[in-house]
């Protein structure tokens, strides 16, 4: 069969920002290393670079980055750092091999008592339950913690599972502040035509 190589890019950074080198047989679960002449940094909310292994917004500078949105200077300024990097809105980490891995979308991040919680991590944990087909979570207002995690669960056919079961499983596998406070069981998750979970519809 043909060898498939992963890459990462956006419309604003066409065609690609990072890639995995061809010829490597192992699956890295990363988006690889930066393209030539491309600089990628991970930054916190104050614009400072984060340490290796820490999550930060993926910012890009290179020949493939757009000049700006057509006749939309304010929108362009909103996604451009003071030193000229494009802010992708994706949260990533950098591993010891120099490879980047996407963690989540920054807009989907949940802030619980000042701690950053990434929905993908919680969803991946809950998906390991035998009784769960799939799951998705969002942040909801909470008087004590500003935001709390609300988890939507689609059960496996004929599975018997309740909210207490899910919360107990999360407590065994997640840090305390990441454990969902609310559980909702639904028949199916809203998705785009390509199968992407639409968290915005869950918020509505």
Describe the predicted segments one by one.
Residues 5-12, 32-34, 138-141, 184:
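Beta-strand->loop->alpha-helix junctions that form or flank phosphate-binding loops
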